[in-house]
Structures are given as structure tokens and as C-alpha cells.
Amino acid sequence: MAYSIANNPLLRKNFAKIHKIIDIPNLIDIQKNSYKRFLQLDTPVDARKNSGLEAVFRSVFPIRDFSDTASLEYVSYSLGAPKYDVEECHQRGMTFAAPMKVKVRLVVWDVAKDPGTRSIRDIKEQEVYFGEIPLMTDNGTFIINGTERVIVSQLHRSPGVFYDHDKGKTHSSGKVLYSARVIPYRGSWLDFEFDHKDILYVRIDRRRKMPATVLLKALGYSNDALINYFYKSEDVKVGDNGSMTKIADAELLSNQKATADIVDPATGEVILKANRKFTKAAIRKMSEHGIKEIPISEEEVVGKVASHDIYDPATGEIIVECNEELTQAKLEEIIQKGITTFQVLFIDNLHVTSSFRDTILIDKIGSTDEALIEIYRRLRPGDPPTLKSALVLFENLFFNAERYDLSAVGRLKLNYKLGVDVPLDCMTLTREDILEVVRYLIELKNGKGNIDDIDHLGNRRVRAVGELLENQYRIGLVRMERAIKERMSLQEVENLMPHDLINSKPVSAVVKEFFGSSQLSQFMDQTNPLSEVTHKRRLSALGPGGLTRERAGFEVRDVHPTHYGRVCPIETPEGPNIGLIASLSTYARINEHGFVETPYRVVKEGRVTDEVRFFSALEEEGHAIAQANAEIDETGRFAADYISARKSGEFVLVGRDELELMDVAPMQLVSVAASLIPFLENDDANRALMGSNMQRQAVPLLRADSPLVGTGMERVVARDSGVSLVARHNGVVESVDASRIVVKIDEDQYDATGTGVDIYNLIKFARSNQNTCINQRPLVKVGDHVTAGDIIADGPSTDMGELALGQNVLIAFMPWGGYNYEDSILISERLVKDDRYTSIHIEEFEAVARDTKLGKEEITSDIPNLGEETLKDLDESGIIRIGAEVRPGDILVGKITPKGETQLSPEEKLLRAIFGEKAGDVRDTSLRVPPGVEGTVIGAKIFSRKGADKDARTEIIEKAEEMRLRKDEQDEIRIIRDSAIGKLKKLLVGKTAAVKIEGTDGKVLIPKGAAITEEMLKSFSMDRWDEISIADDDTVDEKVAQTLSTLNQQIDIIKYVFDDKVQKLRRGDDLPPGVIKMVKVYIAIKRKLQVGDKMAGRHGNKGVVSRILPEEDMPYMEDGRPVEIVLNPLGVPSRMNVGQILEMHLGWAAKGLGWKIEEFLDKNAPHDEIKRFLKGAYNNPDMDRFLDKLEGEELLNVAKRLKRGVPMSSPVFEGASEESIQSMLSHAGFSTTGQVTLFDGKSGDKFMHQVTVGIMYFLKLHHLVDDKIHARSIGPYSLVTQQPLGGKAQFGGQRLGEMEVWAMEAYGAAYALQEFLTVKSDDVAGRTRMYEAIVKGKHTLEPGLPESFNVLIKELQSLGLDVELLEGDED
């Protein structure tokens, strides 16, 4: 049990005051859930939802031929088992993928002469192989060609309708022009916009604009219908004497002025004086007095617009047309003709403008047909329009589900914005939608409604892996559809089977391209567990269909109020991608529509409940949300009357009864990386950003050391990252060694197919994508009981199941001899000596033997012209032995390549004569160690062609692997056999035998009627136990027979699985064409901390090691302990990352408590005293109960674990207060200032002032000086310019640029400069002569023409300028 006690989360003292309501959701669920929804593997075929892959197939099929005589219909798809498992794919450079089969049905029809009638002639159904589809590993990654990749989720603009204005920038007058845009998921964009004359225009797919009424008329609406849809009308009555009144409509009257006194007809009382506004009170008074009509003057009516045609009652002819302005003459004609009522449009040019009416006036198109033809002309200029083709084009634009898809999200957003109620499965636009879009735009211009904020997270959604791949599949299937249609029309369909029609190559090609080279398919950042988790949780606004760096402005990159709890405001890259790449917050998840949701606790009547609901940014609008740290009394009510809350993106004070929601935790605001920074609340945001980003670059160290001051997130990250081994079932540890753990599962945990044994093979010294070392170490001992979910082995950068990126080091803040000027770091030699910051890096080198035109390359140790000393570490196969220490230039794999027959020089002829033929016709092309690599060979893998002879080394490797597999097989069989024996003994011992059992020699082993004992059972083989029969109890016989048959079945399964693995092992490998053999050699490089390495704390406090000082010269404390790192105090105030100081103080207290516990252990203090001290330090009732249960050895185990310091957890935004830190310091026996007196290590003098000393968690980053330092003697040259290449990877030279040339000129160093620009760079002939001169011991320089000068001349000649070099005398 020691394991579970030492691993108890309670041992980390927690300063959080808010109890946890919900656990943090699994950190990589964003990837796993999306892919699960895409594949729907666990769902039965007939129960699959219309989403993901299923939706793609259903949308593209059925495919019909052009004459509609045959159709290819989709039935279902299924996935087979992957050919190689994850580990094998890593080793062989394969893709981890499953073969996909699609069941399709080909239906052939007989078409009769009568139109519309047809009968089925033939139906054929068949499963067709459809290529491979990559599978996701358990850790949310994909293995493509042997490397682990992550598909980053994309944040893009959600489909739907968006309203915006140009902020007055388009027109010189500064007038604000409004516009609306309908964006579908796929299909044509529709834009409506006003110009500066207030005319409404429409664009389709950003083509030329036309009046919006053209589009509306094409939908089938007439001028009258449109006018009356967008405007309200007023009824005007004409009296006998020609006086006019209008009907009092309360809705239209508000905000208008009375033109004459409004008088109560009964009493004559003036209710509203002329030129006064119709207020609500006035309108109410009018209705009380029964006033239904208001007098209106002729001047007011003149200039109004008729809302309907006005007819002459006698003749029926039209006096005024709809949308015609009433003139004085027309008005007089109306009165004269005796028309008593007519209707005019309500346009006051204040709240209702005449813009739509003006648009109708400039639009000269009368009918729907004309409108359709006009749209056709605009979209297809040059094509002769016909009414039919125009109608088809228009219908296809917005109303055909195959061409236009709003998606469920788009429909949801459209319904939400326009207030319509169209079912979510209607994914195309409706005519009403378009009218409503225009209506909202007109109202927006008239001052009602709001424009949309495109950076609001309700308008941006996430496309995760599943959806990105779904889109790729659709592209592939559409390409395939074209090919199928062509094949159907070219060949006789009735003679074909479905597989003759389907060629899945286009689909496979698209998927392969997506995983291999899409901007969103990225090489996984595998530096440490945190960087893996963060990479999988990343959201990118870049990528296909997203933004580009150059076009993205400040607004898109900025933090938005809706990011709260959804997207981290801190973690984003520095540089050109800032704000475009973000990280999901800790508690956030993505809903089925792709919107980011965050959890809140529900508040009912001022009382906070434990009910948790997830809200997207749109759903949260308008709710008042309290902070997680708002004070609550014991009944769950808010303590204060007014609470600081967030509402619609603003911080407001709200009465407690108005609150509806409350945050679940203070750290729901930030991402995983930021939540690992203790005292984040005391750091400046810029430095917190650097701290988050640099934690991802921390190199896994040789000895992981979890932080003394953490935040409580360390365990969560280690568990979810997948680098640690997590127990699958409850059980007891049977055996443990460095490379595997065997757990016997508890009986109540057996599942139907399981064998009762879990074998965990640990990863040993594997190479990560970033060349860091992945190694797992067991944490459990034989006999330990483990529970499902326990961490049983640590991975890289984890310590006892907690993330451990760096080391806890003793730090002093003081200047020291200028060695910590400008963020430099002075470190003690002690850190190097103890290997505290030593890391292991693994490099992989590959040698390939190919079949060339001149013959086969050969991997061998027999290499011409090399001495014994050079080949001493190669075995007879030519491959270096494991354990060899290699340096740059050493041979890793010996390889010779045949070389073509050439004219031999006299020296070569002599060599031939001495050494025979062999030396001449091959050349040495061995794989050698590149410069800058020095280490130990830790492995070699050999891949040979199928059918090729295996060399000795391959056979040794295969044997070792086979033995490992056999051992697993035997252990599994032994454990399940033992557990079966245990069960059978329970059933049989003590029961009475009904028949006697005899041995092979006739000896009676169990007499009839005897009570069965264990000895009797041991005396013969278990296979015969089913012969035993029990008197008076038939059920026992049945149970025995059943147990034995189950056991045999399980053993058969195990043997089958292992035999299959061995077969795979012995088979040859699939190598690329032309490759005979491939050898991979792995070298482990041990990197100690050295001058030039970059280090950092968690608060953005980074620096470079400037000097490694002997331990005795470091400043030391009064008790003689030297500090380990000295940092510059000037690095703190201007950077404003004070969190590091608080972390130091708390770490100092934690270390002090550890030293006290060590004192107790050293003096063998009574257990009660140790318990008392621990209870005082933890001050936590749960911990008190835990400590009370511990006795003797268990208590000592805990004390030993705490000797290195009592780990603390100071969660983000609810960390330890100043008072808590001071009380911890005094409990540890330190000064509450956190400062101590230091002495100079060199002189022994006391420093003048006290110095802040404490424990800070410090990381070594991946920017190691060994990887950066580089020198070149002779190396490759560029083909065109003949100048040396640049960069370490190309083994390049140092560039001497324009400015450096000026500097040399300024110093008058003419000869040095001539050398730089000619023989040391691109004077080809000159460099050859220089080489010869050096060989002969002469020191002469003959510069010639630089090659780049020739390039310049050729370039001028290509422009048609005849440039020639004239050779001649200087005159």
C-alpha cells in the first residue's frame, strides 16, 4: 500500500478556498470526441446519425448517369482492423490507418416510352474497397509515415447572416453605409449594401452590384407586394368639404408632431396643442376621449407616396399608381372625383427613410422573368440567356441543397438573428429569409437593431479534426462522382459491377494530402507532456478557408469579452501569429455546432446551486454572471447585497437576486499552460504569456522533480497527456521490471473478453519528434494494489504522477560580479555535478542501400582503404554495436556503392595492382556521425525486403523481440491458470468425490467417497480435473467444466494473438521501391547544463547561463549552505512579474518544512511529534484524518517523501495570500521577510544587505547551445551563385553582408576584403588554386572573377543588353 500513500494528492498542501464543483474535462477530448463523431465506429451501421463520414456519403450518393437510367446508391461503410499497431507504425515509418469498405448498390432502370414511368431492371449490391483512413491514437494524434502529427482545430467565421457598416470610410462625406452578408457553409455569398445615395444594392458572389429589388423580383414579388412588405401605410379620409383626416394609428403616431390642435369633439377641450409631440400619455388620452381621426392639412399630404393604385370610382382608370408621389394636381383630382379614402406610405425620413422606395424607382425591371434574365446576364456575361437556363441558375444559387448548404449552424444563426422559425434541417435559404435579411438591414439603417461583431465567439466557430476531414472527404467524393458519371455514360451499365465504376484513388489522394501537407496538420510538438497537450488544444484562425497573417488586423487578434472561460487571453505566440493562434481554456468544450462552451453554476433566487450548465457565447448574452470568488455564506447565498458581475461583456454591480449564473472556478479563464503558473495573478500579462510559452519548451530532465510550489494542475496534465501509464483495471501487481508491469486483475473487474491480466510494456528510451527522450519508469512494487486510473509508471517530465518540467533550486536575488547583467544567470557547479539539469537527447540516423543502375549498394564492414581502428565498433554486418561511444566522423553503418568505369590515374592503377580489383570499382558511402554529435549508440533497427536474406544482426534483434513476446505470453497464461486453479480449489476442496480417479500407473489418486484435499489435486494434472465428480452436487461439476473450458479458450486466444505477432516479426518489411535494406541507428546524447544554455522560470523570467561558478565561490548562508543560482534583482521591477518573488517565499517555506521533517527523522523523533508537526503545517481536516490513519512504517514513508520539501499548491487567482506565506515561513522557522544574510564565497565577507533567498522552479529550455554552435571549413556551395550555403542544417558559412563590406572598407582592409569576396566565397577557379597553393606550402593569392559577377552579366544579357568583358591593357 506504500505506493498509494506516497502518491496521495493530499500531500500537496492546497491554498484554494473554493471547493471544486466539477472536474476539469479530459484535456484532449476536443480531438477524441470530434474524431469519434466523424467515424461513428461504435455505432451500429443502421443507427448511425447523419453526421461526419456518414453525412458525406449520403450527400454525394446516389450518383445517377446523365440519362437517368442507372443510379449508384450508398448503403453503409465499415472499417477493418489496422495492418500495423501504433508501435509498429512508428518503427516502420507507416501510417496508422484502417482499410475502409463501402457497400454500394447499383440500380439499373427500364425507362418506358411514357414520360415519368420506369421499372427496375437490375439491382447489384457489393462491398468496394475504399482506401485507408487514418485512425486516431488514444492520445489524440495521428501517425503519418511513422511520425506523430496533430490536426489543429480551426477557428473560422460561422455561417449565417452578418450586418456591418463601413464606419464612414467608403465615401468622402463620411456617411455610414450599412451592409448585410449571408455566408453559407458552402455555396454563393449574398451581399446587400447601401450606397451614399441610400439606394440598396445586391451582389452575388462579390460580382457587379445591381439594385436589390432585381433579386426580390426574381423571387416572384411585384412592386406593390414589396412596397407594402417594407413600409406601413396610413389611411387618409377626405371629408365632404375637402378637409382631410388620417386614422390615428398609435404605433405610427409616436414621435410625430401634431400639425393642428387636437380637440375632443364632445367637449371642445384641446388635448394636444399644435407642434407638440405625440407622447405616450397624449396617445393614451386621445384613445380615452375616443378620438380616432386626426386633422391633416393638404400641404402634409402633398409629397406623400401612394401605397396602392388609386382608381377613379366611375371609370375604373388609375389616377395615381402605387409608389407614385402625390402632387397638388393629383390630390385635387382625387378630391374632385369624390374618392373618400386612400392610403399613403408612412415615410417620415427620420425613423423610416425612403431608401427602398428610391431603389424601386431606379430599378427599370418590371417582371420576374426579366429579373431572372438580368441576374443570368450579370453572373454569366457572354452566355445567351434563355428563361429556362436563367431559372435553373437562380434556383441552383440559393435553393438547391446540392449547391448551397447553410449547415445546421448557419440555419441556427439565421433563425436567431432574424427571429424566424424555420426547421434546423432546412439547410438552404427560403424566400422569406431573403426578405427578412433585407428588412433587418433597412431597419438597421433606420436606427433599430445592432450590427454584428465578427470577433464575438457567437460568430466564430471551431472546426475540429472530424469536420476538417469531412470537408476533405467531400472534395474527394465529388471528384470521384464526376469520374463515375462519365464511366456510366461511356459503358453499358447493365454489364458492370459497382467496383468497375468506383475508383477510390481521388478520395485517398485528398485525405493523404490533407494529413501530409495541410497547414492544419502539424508535426506534433513533443518536447514535453505539456507541449503535447497544448498542441492538441490549440485553435488557429489560419489555414484553408481562414485568415492570412498579412490580412488579419488588430481586432481579430485582440482579446474579446466572449473569450472569458472559452479561449485563453494569455497564451498565444509572440510574433506575426499573435492573437491568431489561441488555446482553449481549461474548462471549455466544443458543442455539436462547433461553438466553444464554458460551464457556469446555476443561481436560483440568490442561492448558488451545484447544478452546472454549459453556455456558448450567444446563450450567455444578457445573463448576469458572478465571479467564482464572490463570497457565499454556508447556505449558499451571496454574502453581499451587491455583487460584481459580468453582463453583456461589461463589469457591473448587480443585486444578488438578479444574478443567474456563477463561474465554476477562478482558473476557468485561462488555458492549461497558464494555469500551471503559481501566483499568475501577480504577473504582468506580457510576462505571463512568455511564461506559458516557455513551459512548453522545457526539456525533460534526467531526474524529474515536481514543483514544490505548484497550482494543482500538474497531476491533471500528467494524467491526460498520455505520457504516464494509467492502470486500466483494479488489481494486484504480479511482477515489475524496468520494461514491463504485470497486473493481475481483481475478479470483480473481469470483462467478457478479458484474460484477467493486464500487461503494460513500458516505453524505454524512445525518440520524440523533438529528439528528446521518452522513457517510462515504474512507480509500483510487487504486491501493491492499484485502482483503475492510478498512475503506475512515470513518463518523461513526470514525477509521482505529477508534471515535472524543471527543478526546485535555491535562488538568491543579487548582482554578482556582473555575471548576471542583462538577464544572464550565474549557476553553481553543484547543479552540473549532481546532473540536476542534465537531459538526454536521442538522434536517429538512417542508411539506405538501394539498387542503382551500376549495381546494388551493399551494407558491409568490408570497406576499402579503412584501417582496423576505424572499423573496430562495426559487427560483421557492417552495423555499429550497441553501447559504442561515437564522435563526429565515426562510421555508424558501413556501405559501399558501385562506381562507374572511369579512366584511372597512375596512382589508382598502382593501388589496383597492389590491392586487387575490389578497391577500385566501389566507393565508400558509409553513414557517418555528423559534426556536433557525440554520444552512445542505444539501438539499431534493420528493415529488409521481403524474401531477402537476413544478416546475423537482424536475426539477433528478431530473437530478442521474440523472447520478449514469448515471456509476455507465458506470464499471461501462468496468471490466468493460477487464478483458475484458485477458483477450482475453492469449488472442490472439502467436497466428497463421487468417483475414484486413478493415475496412469493405476494408482488411486482420489478414492471414491473421500473428501478432496489440496494434496490430492496436486498429485495429477489440472487438465484431468474435469473427470472429478462431486457427490450430491451437480452444479459443482458444471462450474468446474465451465471454468476449465473458459481457461482453455483464453489460452487459445492468447496463443493466437502472440503467434500472429511473431509471424509479423518474421515477415519482411514493405520498403519503398528500389530500396534493398534500411538501417536506423539511434544515438543518445547526454547534455549537461553549460554556458550558453537558455533557462527560465515560470513567470517569463528567462536568461542565458553566463558562468558556472565552483560551489565554494557561490554566496552562502549562515549555516554554510551555498545558493545554487544567482539572478539579477533588476529583472523584476520593470518586468512586473512579482509572482516569482511570492513563489520564492512560499518555496522557501516549503523547503524549510522539509528540513524540519528531516531533523525529526534524523533524531528518530516520536511518531506523535511528527504527526503534530505535519498537522500544524497542513492545517487541513482531511489531511488530519489521513495522518491519523497512518502508523509506523507508513508514516515514515510519508515523512521521507516530504523531506525534500512540503509540496504546495497555489491555484491561479485563488493562491496563497501574503498572510498565508508569512505564517508558513514562521512555521518553517524563517524570517517572515523571506530574506537572509549571505556571505561572499570568495572572501567570506558578509554582504552589506540582507538578500531575498528562496526556492524557485527553474526550467532548462530547448534552446541548447550545442544545437546552435556551428563552424564550417569546406562545405557545399549554391549551384547558381557558387557561394557557400547558409545555416547549420546545410553546413553553411557565415554571411558577409552589405553592411559588413562597408565596415571592412571603412577600415581600409582592402586585401582582407578581396579575399572574402573572391577565394573564400564564389571565385571557383581562385579557390581551387588557393587549395593547391596551401597543399604545396605556398601562400600566394590569385583572385579571379567571382561567379556572382557572371550571374549579373547573364541577367543583363537576358534583358537584351549586350554586355561583354573586354580583356586588354589598362590604358
From Swiss-Prot:
- Tell me one GO biological process term: DNA-templated transcription
Which is one Pfam family of this protein? RNA_pol_Rpb2_6
Gene Ontology CC terms, in alphabetical order? DNA-directed RNA polymerase complex
What does the record give as EC number?
2.7.7.6
Which Cys-Cys disulfides exist here? none
> Which reactions fall under this protein's catalytic activity?
RNA(n) + a ribonucleoside 5'-triphosphate = RNA(n+1) + diphosphate
**UniProt entry tagged with the keyword Transferase:** yes
Question: Keyword Nucleotidyltransferase: yes or no?
Answer: yes
- Please give the CDD domains that the UniProt record associates with this protein: RNA_pol_B_RPB2
Q: Where are the transmembrane segments?
A: none
* Alphabetically ordered keywords of this record: DNA-directed RNA polymerase, Nucleotidyltransferase, Transcription, Transferase
Q: Name one GO molecular function term.
A: ribonucleoside binding
Relate the protein's function as given in its record.
DNA-dependent RNA polymerase catalyzes the transcription of DNA into RNA using the four ribonucleoside triphosphates as substrates.
Q: How does it assemble?
A: The RNAP catalytic core consists of 2 alpha, 1 beta, 1 beta' and 1 omega subunit. When a sigma factor is associated with the core the holoenzyme is formed, which can initiate transcription.
| Family label | Belongs to the RNA polymerase beta chain family.
Q: What is this protein identified as? A: DNA-directed RNA polymerase subunit beta
